[in-house]
Amino acid sequence: LSLHDALPILMNYTHEKPVYPLTFEIFPAQEGAQAAFTLYEDEGEDLGYQRDEFVKTPIICSTLANGYELTVSAREGKGYTVPGPRNLLFRIYSAKAPKEVTVKGKKIKKTKPERLEENLENDTETVVWSWDKETGVCSVRMPDKGGNEQIMIAFK
């Protein structure tokens, strides 16, 4: 069993692992349209959500003629704080192979798909991407800083 075929990280109960990577499976819309999602987070074990103790993170994937623009907006909310540093892993399903990936305009390093998730739970500094032509998945790994991020995936 290779790392690429490994099972996802599972937890038996809330807070078993207070900090863990978040994986987003993204199926982009047709050209000129968007796929959008809002990540909702709260304590998970109390009624704080009734007191507006939560945060939301809007995520939008825009399909362009030459690639995808993935926008992760800054966390919005109050009363809840993410318990520590963690990674975000985006898996974008695409029929086209990417040429390059940039984060905030800066080109990021490409790695092999089987190496992308190495030390994913502990190394919260690495920013890399990979292309798996067998599955048609472009994966982008980056630390969750809680702020605005713009990821551009350009086609060949």
Summary of predicted features, one role per range:
Residues 1, 6-99, 103-106, 111, ...:
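Catalytic core of carbohydrate-active enzymes
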Residues 55-57, 88-90, 119-121, 126, ...:
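Generic alpha-helical propensity signal that fires on short helical segments
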Residues 106-146:
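Extracellular/luminal ectodomains and secreted, surface-exposed scaffolds of diverse proteins
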Residues 147-156:
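Low-complexity, intrinsically disordered segments enriched in Ser/Thr together with acidic residues
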